[in-house]
Amino acid sequence: MSTETKETRPETKPEDLGTHTTVDVPGEEPLGELIADDVNEVVSDASATETDFSLSPSQSEQNIEEDGQNSLDDQSPLTELQPLPLPPPLPVEARISESLGEEESSDLVTEQQSQNPNAAEPGPRARKRRRRKRFFTEINANPAFSRNRRTSVGKEVDSEALIAMSVGFPVYSLTEEEIEANVVSIIGGKDQANYIVVRNHIIALWRSNVSNWLTRDHALESIRAEHKTLVDTAYNFLLEHGYINFGLAPVIKEAKLRSFDGVEPPNVVVVGAGLAGLVAARQLLSMGFRVLVLEGRDRPGGRVKTRKMKGGDGVEAMADVGGSVLTGINGNPLGVLARQLGLPLHKVRDICPLYLPNGELADASVDSKIEASFNKLLDRVCKLRQSMIEENKSVDVPLGEALETFRLVYGVAEDQQERMLLDWHLANLEYANATLLGNLSMAYWDQDDPYEMGGDHCFIPGGNEIFVHALAENLPIFYGSTVESIRYGSNGVLVYTGNKEFHCDMALCTVPLGVLKKGSIEFYPELPHKKKEAIQRLGFGLLNKVAMLFPCNFWGEEIDTFGRLTEDPSTRGEFFLFYSYSSVSGGPLLVALVAGDAAERFETLSPTDSVKRVLQILRGIYHPKGIVVPDPVQALCSRWGQDKFSYGSYSYVAVGSSGDDYDILAESVGDGRVFFAGEATNRQYPATMHGAFLSGMREAANILRVARRRASSSALNPNQICIDKEEEVDEEEDRCLDQLFETPDLTFGNFSVLFTPNSDEPESMSLLRVRIQMEKPESGLWLYGLVTRKQAIELGEMDGDELRNEYLREKLGLVPVERKSLSQEGESMISSLKAARLNRQIFD
């Protein structure tokens, strides 16, 4: 389930109206939600962008164009439901009647919620409060943290434990990653308690200033010398697994880990340039790997995409048509990126008025009553689930069936307004899971709830593409390269894109679950049966959007969301929720969401019809108030189910599936040859942007572990990465470089320069080539080096090569080297130049 708080809606309070809050991410807090990726566009022509946006059938043919389908911790859960060998399931009605004791109240609305901490799993709101309380209970119950409760040291240890917990570490135990890494010799001993204190201290140290590189020596400063071994262990683990010193701060981007001293670094191909692929590629490059990213679309980001919308009179806005709301910034790695990039965050305000079809606000008392009833229905389902497990009965039934049966048993929402309000909450739940409630597993649909990140939900001004472009900067990405098959064996991996093949030691597949379900990529040998079954069992759902840029904000500046009710339960998910992005997008932007069954029907409609329907709903709300709803100057309609690079929006736990399937999808195949990342491989944070991000970090660490194991056992000659004959590699690389330098960006004397593609920043890197002449005029030696764009321009302005060589040596301390001696950063630069050149050939 998406970790965005979509199951419940805060009560609208008059005193909250008019508030506007912009939040900066606090020291230990970071962000994410995952929705979808590419879009179809509804655009008026230049003459119609002012006020005459016509939606008549005749004009729609002229003024509407569609986008092409280019393509998007372990903290122990409170209760883990394990699948059991069970007898055939009973009908839901029979199970519910058996589960109701004589003491059960038939009045679901007036029943008081139990405060017993040992009661069955509560509903979404109570579940969050209880888990937060449990954090403190764990700390107080742990001798390692309660020894000095009244001292400043004790308080600091407690504070650091909470920061580590927000990142996903349990308070008094190790994560599975730490156990696999053998961070302590004895599980549960004194060393473990001390290690945890040291680990938490290092995390808190770096989180206090995420723009700096935390050194091992700095971590040692406040820890006694006898614990140096623990510091080394914790520091190495946190560094290599991406819990510290990660992100986009300049000092961090420039840092390089010495992971392969004395041996040739392994070669990794990353399939997909979504968040998971970008994060993994950047992390692997920093570790010293040779990396190439293959992306089928003509842009990075995958299901995270921001589109610039514009109209007449200079009206424009940035619209997130994919991942949009940053859900919970506490401990979220995207929050770290926001701090490093100096990005302010806009808190999504809790006010969410719900409008009846006639434009009137829903009755506040009825609204509150039904919201409470909805939460208690979920509580009942949780209690039923627990009792069925205890009685060894099958719980493999649809969530929607159980909710509807309970609704009938307790007589919830019997009049029309109550039913409309309940349907809105059910649509909201379908939004959270990107599917119909009838597809969700009652047993495991909310298996990720114990891991939800706390903190505010936020928008980022300018859209989430800011993260994407910053992560993709200077990465060697080949766009327009759709992977068709992956062959793997004991000697490496072959990745095929059309008529091209890429040889590598290891490959990381980050494509969405929908692509795996569709079988768009063939694997040779076939994926293990267990993995193929998990791919089929897990659900991959659909959410769509209509983004509309208006000439003015007619809905008001005091709210970020509002909803609309419908009398027809079958259309409850059709434009049921609107997000206002006026405060962060740069213009009057409104986004309507389409969830559940409506999201599937939406893809059968034309963009024109969809926009007409949204406008009909908006005018039904605002015209009775005397507010004119103008035509939008531009609109975008998503089509995620039809996108061949995603085939849907995000994952969910379907009937017959469980959280175990996320873990199975995350498993590598071929004895550490092909790895998998993406939100659908993250059991704790599926269906979120931060889940995709963390999965990329996880797999970078796994690839490093396997590479070290392979190097130490000499299973593969580290100098034989791609091709058997080293001479052939050198000759091919020389030919590639000659082709690149046929059209240099600058040339002067014996010097040629190639700038970083798509960047005119003075400090962006440039590849410098110098020809050293030999005795014969026709012969010579090419040497290479890296300089900034500004330095290259300064070189060109100098008088003669002698001064230029002196400038390189004396001022820059640079000695050009042969191609084979070029640094890892230089290799990455060459890969970026190749990718850019290939893209120009494909798209120009």
UniProtKB/Swiss-Prot annotation:
Residue stretches of biased makeup (Acidic residues): 26-40
Compartments where found: Nucleus; Cytoplasm
Record organism: Arabidopsis thaliana (Mouse-ear cress)
First-tier enzyme category under EC: oxidoreductase
Motif Nuclear localization signal in this chain: 516-523
Keywords from the UniProt entry: Chromatin regulator, Cytoplasm, FAD, Flavoprotein, Nucleus, Oxidoreductase, Repressor, Transcription, Transcription regulation
Lineage, broadest ranks: Eukaryota, Viridiplantae, Streptophyta, Embryophyta, Tracheophyta
Region (Disordered): 1-131
Role, per record: Probable histone demethylase that reduces the levels of histone H3 'Lys-4' methylation in chromatin of the floral repressor FLOWERING LOCUS C (FLC) and the sporophytically silenced floral repressor FWA. Seems to act in partial redundancy with FLOWERING LOCUS D (FLD) to repress FLC expression. Required for cytosine methylation of FWA. Controls primary seed dormancy by regulating DOG1 and abscisic acid signaling-related genes. In association with OTU6/OTLD1, involved in transcriptional gene repression via histone deubiquitination and demethylation.
Classification via InterPro entries: Amino_oxidase, FAD/NAD-bd_sf, Flavin_monoamine_oxidase, Homeodomain-like_sf, SWIRM, WH-like_DNA-bd_sf
Name under which the protein is recorded: Lysine-specific histone demethylase 1 homolog 1
One Pfam short name: Amino_oxidase
SWIRM domain location: 154-255
Gene Ontology MF annotations: oxidoreductase activity
